[in-house]
Amino acid sequence: MAADKPADQGAEKHEGAGQSSGVTDQEKELSTSAFQAFTSGNYDACLQHLACLQDINKDDYKIILNTAVAEFFKNNQTTTDNLRQTLNQLKNQVHSAVEEMDGLDDVENSMLYYNQAVILYHLRQHTEAIAVGEKLYQFIEPFEEKFAQAVCFLLVDLYILTHQAEKALHLLAVLEKMISQGSGNKNGKSETGNNSSKDGSNPKAESAALIEAAKSKIHQYKVRGYIQMKSLKACKREIKSVMNTAGNSAPSLFLKSNFEYLRGNYRKAVKLLNSSNIAEHPGFMKTGECLRCMFWNNLGCIHFAMSKHNLGIFYFKKALQENDNVCAQLSAGNTDPGKKFSGRPMCTLLANKRYELLYNCGIQLLHVGRPLAAFECLVEAVQVYHANPRLWLRLAECCIAANKGTSEQETKGLPTKKGIVQSIVGQGYHRKIVLASQSIQNTVYNDGQSSAIPVASVEFAAICLRNALLLLPEEQQDPKQENGSKSSSQLGGNAESSESSETCSSKSHDGDKLIPAPPSSPLRKQELENLKCSILACSAYVALALGDNLMALNHADQLLQQPKLSGSLKFLGHLYAAEALISLDRISDAITHLNPENVTDVSLGISSNEQDQGSDKGENEAMESSGKRAPQCYPSSVNSARTVMLFNLGSAYCLRSEYDKARKCLHQAASMIHPKEVPPEAILLAVYLELQNGNTQLALQMIKRNQLLPAVKAHSDVRKKTVFQPVHPIQPIQMPAFTTVQRK
C-alpha cells in the first residue's frame, strides 16, 4: 500500500502479510481481502483484516505499514503527522540511513521508502525526497510496472520542482519506453510480498485508460521541462501533443499560455488564461493547487513582461488574497497545534504559495518605484529563501532606492536657482547668498538601532550585499551584465514558482552548472557573473555612502577586473573608484580613472531572448513589440557618459588647484550637451572657478540664471582653499533612468 500522491494518481496500493515464501493460505486470503477492501474504499474492513494478519504474524513490519496507510486513508489523508511518525519508526527498524540501501532486502522494503519519499515531497523537502527516489530507481528492475511508473513520476516531479529539467526529460524517455513495451516487470514480486494483489482487476479496459493517462502526463511534464530549458522548438511540438491528449483542460491551457509568454505573445498568453475553465477544477482540497491563485499570479507575470507594472501589482495582490483565503480555510481544520501537518489533506501542504507571491510582488513594486513597499515584501520572502543571492541584491536595491533623492532631482537636475540657493541672509551691503549643500544625508531609519535589524537603511544594504557575495560560488568566468529582476511563473499543472524572465535561452551551454536560487530559476554560469558585477557595483556605491572609502575602492577595483563587464557598469566602476581615491587624497590616481577615453561603451549588455524566441515562429506570426525592453538607463549614450567624466575630472583638477584645466574640462563638457541638461553641480563648479578667478559678478549671474555663462578673462593671484564637496553618487539599481548627479 502506498500513500497516494495527487500528482501521481496511479500510485499503487498493496496489502501483504509477509514474504511470498512460507505464507499460509489463511494469510493469503486475509491479505487479498484486505487489499480488495482498501481499493474499494472500505477502510474499516481493511483494518479488520490487517488486525487478523497482525495476530498471525506479529513480527512483519509491512503489516504495520499497511495499517498506518489504511488509517491515513480512513481519515481522508489528514493524519500526516501520525503516518510520518510510523514511517520513521519503521525506517529505523529496517535501516538507519538511506545510504545503506544496497541489497535485495531493500527491494522488498521499497514501498516503505516510496511512502517516505512521498511525504518528504509534500513537506517540500525536495533534496531528501530525491535522495530516496534515486535509491529506489536503482532497484527499479524487479518492481512491477505500475509501481515502477509511480517511482519515475515522483522523481520527474521532483526534478521539475528543483529545475533539473535535463534529468526529468531523461527519465521521461525511460517512462515512455516502459509504457510502450507494455509488459513491464510482471514477473517481479509485489512491493509488499503479495503476488495475488491484482487478481480482482479487469485488465484491458482499465489498462488502456491508465496508459492514455500516463502518456498525457508525460507530455505535460515534457512541456514543463522544455519551458524550463527555454527550448521552445521542442516545446512547440509537445504542446500539440498535450492539446490532443488533454484537450482544453486548465493544466494544458496554462502550459500553452506559458509557452506563448516565453515567445513574447503576451496578448495570446492572456487570452489562453482567460479561456481556461477554473470552475471545472476539482479544487485545492483534492489537488493541493489553488488554480485561482495561479491564474492571478500568471497574469501578473505577463503584465510585468509587458512593463505594465501597476497592473501587475494589482494581479499579484489578487493572487495573495486568494492564497490567504486558502490558508485561512486550511488552518481552520487544524485543532491540534502540536501536529501542524494534520487536520487537512496531505496534498494541501503544497497549497501555500505566499512567499513566492511576495517575491513576485516585491520585484514588481521595486520596478514601479515603491522601494519601501517592495522591501516589506522581499524581507518576508528572504526569511524562507535566504540562500538566494539575487534576492539579497534586490533587498539592497530597495534600501538604496529608499535612501536616495527624488527622481526629479536626480534625473533632471535642479531646474531653478531655488535648488542651488539655500537661503539669503542679511540686507544691503551685508546681503549674502547661502548655497545649498549637494550632499545627500542618509537619514531614513537612522535612529541609532543596530544595522542588522531589517529596515531599509544603507547600513542594512551593506549586510545584504555581503550576504549576496558570500552566497556566490568562487569560480566564475565570462561575466556579462546582470539581467534584471524579472519574475514569472511556472504555469504547469502541478506547481508554480517565480522565475527570472531574462534567463538564458535554449542556446545557452548545456554544460553550465546550475546554482539553485529559489523561488526564481537557478543561475547559470553567465548569470552568476552578471549577478556578481551588479553586486560589486552596488557594494561600491553603498560603501561610498557609508564613508568606507577603502572598501569602496576594493569593490570598484574588483568590478573593473571582471573579464567581460558591461559598458554601463564599467563606467560606474571608474566613477566609484575615482571618488574613493579622491576621498583618500590620491588625486592623481583618481584623474586616471576619470579619463573620458575610458568610456567607449555604455550598453547594459542585455541579450534579449526575442531573437531566440522568434526563430521558431511560423511565417505568418509576428512578435509583439511590447515588453522585455532594456530600461532607459543613465547615461543614455557615450557622449553623455564622457560629459559626466569631464565634469568630475574638472572637480578633481580643482582639488589640485589646476583651475585652467578644470575650466577647460567644464566648458568642453558643457559644449557636448544641451544647456538645460547641465547638472547643478557643474554650475556650482563654474561659480567656484569664477570666484577663484575674481569674477564675483559673473558668479552671481550664474547663480541667478542657473546656467553657465561665458567666462570673463580675469585672473586673481589669490588662491582660496577649495570648497570641493562630493555629491551623493549615482547608483546602479535598474530604475527608469540613472541620475545625472555626479560626484565632483
UniProtKB/Swiss-Prot annotation:
Residue stretches of biased makeup (Basic and acidic residues): 1-16
Swiss-Prot/TrEMBL keywords: Acetylation, Cytoplasm, Nucleus, RNA-mediated gene silencing, Transcription, Transcription regulation, Translation regulation
UniProt modified residues of type N-acetylalanine: A2
Annotated Gene3D superfamilies: Tetratricopeptide repeat domain
Compartments it resides in: Cytoplasm; Nucleus
Protein source organism: Rattus norvegicus (Rat)
Region described as Disordered: 1-26, 183-204, 475-522, 602-632
GO biological process annotation, one example: mRNA catabolic process
Function: Component of the CCR4-NOT complex which is one of the major cellular mRNA deadenylases and is linked to various cellular processes including bulk mRNA degradation, miRNA-mediated repression, translational repression during translational initiation and general transcription regulation. Additional complex functions may be a consequence of its influence on mRNA expression. Is not required for association of CNOT7 to the CCR4-NOT complex.
InterPro entries reported for this sequence: CNOT10 (IPR039740), TPR-like_helical_dom_sf (IPR011990), TPR_rpt (IPR019734)
Family according to the record: Belongs to the CNOT10 family.
Composition skew (Low complexity), residue ranges: 496-506
Protein name: CCR4-NOT transcription complex subunit 10
Description of how the protein assembles with itself and partners: Component of the CCR4-NOT complex; distinct complexes seem to exist that differ in the participation of probably mutually exclusive catalytic subunits. CNOT10 and CNOT11 form a subcomplex docked to the CNOT1 scaffold.
GO CC term (a single one): cytoplasm
Residue stretches of biased makeup (Polar residues): 183-200, 602-612
